[in-house]
């Protein structure tokens, strides 16, 4: 599989638009495309899947470790792999480039195309590109695609870039301004792909514009084949019956996490929004993140499911819930009744409560996880819970000021663990083994 990384100088720089347009263009040519996303984001991978028709995979060096990232990449297959970067090219943890798109490009040894959205500049854009290219000589930036500009402005910038770089940086083309390409956002990023009724029309338009204004055949020459990486992330079948909540309200899952659960036994997906009962005779319940606050009324109205889950958990069924899953297990979300396994309620704040990479230390004796086990995680939420339930997590985030910010989380009761932390099992295999033992 030949692959390339689509990066930018900032968030909102056009990476997702170009990535989706390029994926759609290649799929329309009858090619098999594998999508990847740098970092922890769930929403972009869902957009990839809506185009390619196959699983898109996260590549997160902090959550998964270098070997985990290589294993995830090794699971990808197709004619071409397209990796969508995260934030600006060099933006990593704090004020370093650690875990950034640039860092990943060096691990996988893959070339980079920069997507830039210029405004009211000409030669200064060349200075910006030169600074990005020369900032780290160990990465390979092969060219640029300009985004959201007119044809006349593109021709001006193309000449400036070509004359300045003398062919060392290719100008592959541009995407013109077009309102049809915009994707709506909400408090945690883009609106989910499953909620956009006109998504197919948007993708078709994006692909059409990209084919007309970007030299796709020239770009494909720069896709590169990388090493064959090992994938040692497998578990023995324990014949477990596992239920996973999956619908419009709960769909933030890393694909590899689900694949590991499938290796452990039989996985059945159910909808907390629509189903009345859980799958029968389950040993383990997994409720991931999502947007339960958006669907709180519909979740609250499904009384049969709320009672079913509460009774199962009270009877001792093992359960792991992340972020939105934690909110769902509380008594209420913003006044709408929920499962009520944990005492207390969830509320929406006006700002992010905790954002970014953090490290969990299990700091209190409990029946699920060993004391002092450490877990890399990511948090991204505006909600908070008001509860006095027992916590076993001490969560620490290292700030760009060199200080440590710490807080408590990880609510436990009987055989249930619920927390705001999102965890990738590739970086925390022992964590998963303890949860399902």
From Swiss-Prot:
CDD domains assigned to the protein according to its UniProt record, in alphabetical order: CobB_N, GATase1_CobB
Catalytic reaction equation(s): cob(II)yrinate + 2 L-glutamine + 2 ATP + 2 H2O = cob(II)yrinate a,c diamide + 2 L-glutamate + 2 ADP + 2 phosphate + 2 H(+)
Annotated catalytic residues: 323 (nucleophile)
Keywords: ATP-binding, Cobalamin biosynthesis, Glutamine amidotransferase, Ligase, Magnesium, Nucleotide-binding
GO MF annotation list: ATP binding; cobyrinic acid a,c-diamide synthase activity
Cofactor(s) it depends on: Mg(2+)
InterPro entries registered for this protein in UniProt: CbiA/CobB_synth, Class_I_gatase-like, CobQ/CobB/MinD/ParA_Nub-bd_dom, GATase_3, P-loop_NTPase
Further comment: The a and c carboxylates of cobyrinate are activated for nucleophilic attack via formation of a phosphorylated intermediate by ATP. CbiA catalyzes first the amidation of the c-carboxylate, and then that of the a-carboxylate.
Notes on the domains: Comprises of two domains. The C-terminal domain contains the binding site for glutamine and catalyzes the hydrolysis of this substrate to glutamate and ammonia. The N-terminal domain is anticipated to bind ATP and cobyrinate and catalyzes the ultimate synthesis of the diamide product. The ammonia produced via the glutaminase domain is probably translocated to the adjacent domain via a molecular tunnel, where it reacts with an activated intermediate.
Protein name: Cobyrinate a,c-diamide synthase
Originating species: Clostridium acetobutylicum (strain ATCC 824 / DSM 792 / JCM 1419 / IAM 19013 / LMG 5710 / NBRC 13948 / NRRL B-527 / VKM B-1787 / 2291 / W)
